[in-house]
Amino acid sequence: SSAASDVYKRQEKGSAIMYSSLDTVWVLLCTALIFFMQAGFAMLETGFTRAKNAGNIIMKNLMDYCIGSVLFWVIGFSFLYGDSIGGFIGTPSLFAAGKFAAAGDLPKRVFLMFATVFCSTATTIVSGAMAGRTKFKAYLTYSAVMSGIVYPITGHWIWNSAGWLKSIGFHDFAGGTAVHVVGGTTALIGALLVGARIGKFDKNGKARAIPGHNLTIGALGIFILSLIHISEPTRLALISY
């Protein structure tokens, strides 16, 4: 009957709204956990380096998010998820204006927050490789370029449905390539450019140990990152499927 059909449609609509709300809550939870990786990186790097570098490292990790997130919101997000130009870069759109199919049924603000913390993670990976060897202003320049250009464009190749790597069947799960390989490769390039730490080698070229100043803080950073990395594939699996 028409009455029964109306009841069924209302129930179906209610279920869809409920599941959509649960998806949103879950993604927000995942966003908070991934954001907390910044604390893990900061503790790890600070504890395993010399005390004189502690303030510099903490500020660099803080600026990775503060500066990086702004640039990602302003232009990087559209480079990553905007309509593809030849499979290499998204159509520029200031402040994530317009619709983005990648968000699916999620509110765009929620999806933007989720994408931003991934960008911050890729940027912060480099900090540890160059800890104690870069000037603060130089690092800020790197952070801006990485967040606004490098990560969004390479991510477009992999995560955008029209990206050139995606179109030939490349599959990235949990950011293994888009976040960790890109961040790790950039860290390697940075380490090669800045060279060894001052005092690392004696006059005969023999390497000398440079112990960290606080192993307790360093260990705390390891535990934070381990917890989040262990749970990361599960979170991404539930979000993706």
Which sequence ranges carry the predicted segments?
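Hydrophobic alpha-helical transmembrane bundles of multi-pass membrane proteins
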Residues: K13-S231
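Short, small-residue-biased leader/transition segments that mark boundaries at the very start
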Residues: S1-Y8, E232-R235, S240-Y241
